[in-house]
């Protein structure tokens, strides 16, 4: 995700600086995914192609190579869903120098952020060899001309993220890369006009929200884009709850105007005019991947009854997204929406939570009946994060005039290319009775 701090350095330069933190390598294996897809900025496509990769290590070389699709597709305002890629016809052979050559057939789902210009085919230009030494050499040779123009501190651990092989001036020798021409088609999993399950959100008469904000820099105490985003969201809560018709309670009883690290756990709760209740808890952490046990315990208290869980901060190139998916406690039949608001989170979300929810709910074998994931196909600014979380909260509060996901997403910075998965089995339509009215 990007920061608007120090605008003098330029918007794209900060994107590079922010997204470079916390690189993660390959996506986790999973047998369950969140299913279909809806967005007001992107269309879901399937890219089918034959690939080839060489490596001196047997440890997931295909995964390592496909990571470079993140960078290339980001250059097209798009990104692929790595954990659900379908691989067939995988064949291994030895090269003359003792390395392993793997040929494979792949079908990659892509959130394509240019819905008005859908190509019939697309050429991936991926590194041929992904061994450690080969990636280091590839990075050293091409970390200036073949990366996003704002990238910096590029190394073999982040080259795949900034990789832009279609740049003017990017000269890649045929021996260095594999050019795979993908056939492109629309995915049958694209949906439109799907609503959140308002009848499930409000069946107990309460909307409970957890909004987590990660710092831009671990250990920061001030002058930090993540802390500023947290403070801005707290100010939004103060303003919105001041309009509540019922009594407003806060924890702590007195919340500073800029709570920051002095009050990293705040809650607003109020009764609405028709008897419904809204409760929003905002939390500030360094980063999810290294969060202390105190955060885990607090999250376990809040998560079972939460209707919306929004994480705003570094994706850590997938690390923080997957770390949050492994935390919390869940309740049978509890419908929940997760908003993973960080860099390219569509690429990094795996099936961990879907699998957990499927095991918890016998009537939900796919793990999507009681859960949706809202993710980004592109990065997001820290300064956009408070408004993005508020947009979804406001959408859920709009039960008198229900909003589709596409309508809700109009309140979010379009640069993020936000989308939802898991909504394909939603049944809510306007006019359906809610819980406590």
Sequence positions of predicted segments:
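Extracytoplasmic/secreted cell-surface and envelope-processing proteins
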Residues: 219-223, 290-291, 317-325, 347-351, ...
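Catalytic-core segments of thiol-dependent peptidases
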Residues: 254-345
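Active-site-proximal C-terminal subdomain of hydrolase catalytic domains
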Residues: 337-437
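C-terminal motif of bacterial Sec signal peptides marking the signal peptidase cleavage site
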Residues: 20-22
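Bacterial signal peptide processing site
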Residues: 24-26
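Long, solvent-exposed N-terminal ectodomains/accessory regions
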Residues: 31-112
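Non-catalytic propeptide/linker segments at domain boundaries
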Residues: 106-262
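Bacterial N-terminal signal peptides that target proteins for export
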Residues: 2-14
């Amino acid at each position: 995700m990007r920061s608007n701090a120090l605008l003098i350095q330029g918007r794209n330069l900060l994107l590079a600086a922010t997204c470079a933190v916390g690189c993660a390598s390959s996506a986790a294996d999973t047998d369950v995914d969140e299913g279909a897809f809806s967005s007001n900025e992107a269309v879901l496509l399937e890219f089918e192609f034959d690939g080839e990769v060489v490596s001196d290590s047997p440890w997931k070389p295909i995964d390592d190579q496909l990571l470079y699709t993140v960078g290339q597709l980001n250059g097209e305002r798009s990104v692929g869903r790595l954990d659900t890629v379908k691989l067939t016809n995988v064949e291994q052979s030895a090269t003359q120098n003792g390395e392993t050559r793997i040929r494979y057939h792949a079908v990659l789902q892509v959130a394509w952020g240019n819905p008005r210009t859908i190509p019939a085919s697309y050429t991936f230009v991926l590194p041929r060899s992904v061994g450690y030494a080969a990636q280091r050499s590839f990075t050293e040779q091409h970390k200036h001309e073949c990366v996003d123009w704002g990238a910096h501190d590029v190394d073999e651990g982040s080259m795949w993220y900034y990789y832009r092989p279609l740049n003017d001036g990017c000269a890649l020798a045929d021996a260095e890369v594999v050019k795979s021409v993908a056939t492109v088609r629309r995915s049958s999993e694209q949906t439109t006009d799907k609503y959140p399950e308002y009848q499930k959100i409000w069946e107990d008469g309460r909307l409970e929200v957890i909004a987590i904000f990660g710092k831009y820099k671990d250990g920061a105490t001030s002058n930090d884009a993540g802390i500023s985003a947290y403070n801005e969201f707290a100010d939004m809560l103060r303003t919105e709850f001041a309009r509540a018709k019922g009594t407003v309670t806060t924890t702590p009883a007195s919340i500073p105007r800029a709570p920051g690290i002095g009050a990293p756990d705040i809650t607003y709760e109020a009764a609405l005019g028709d008897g419904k209740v809204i409760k929003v808890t905002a939390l500030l952490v360094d980063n999810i991947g290294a969060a202390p046990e105190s955060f885990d315990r607090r999250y376990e208290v809040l998560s079972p009854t939460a209707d919306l869980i929004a994480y705003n901060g570094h994706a850590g190139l997938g690390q923080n997204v997957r770390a949050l998916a492994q935390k919390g406690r869940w309740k049978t039949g509890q419908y929940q929406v997760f908003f993973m608001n960080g860099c390219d989170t569509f690429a990094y979300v795996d099936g961990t939570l879907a699998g957990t929810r499927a095991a918890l709910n016998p009537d939900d074998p796919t793990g999507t009946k009681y859960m949706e994931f809202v993710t980004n196909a592109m990065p997001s600014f820290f300064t956009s994060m408070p408004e993005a979380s508020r947009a979804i909260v406001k959408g859920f509060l709009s039960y008198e005039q229900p909003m589709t996901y596409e309508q809700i997403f109009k309140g979010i910075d379009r640069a993020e290319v936000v989308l939802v998965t898991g909504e394909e089995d939603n049944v809510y339509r306007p006019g359906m009775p809610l819980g406590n009215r």
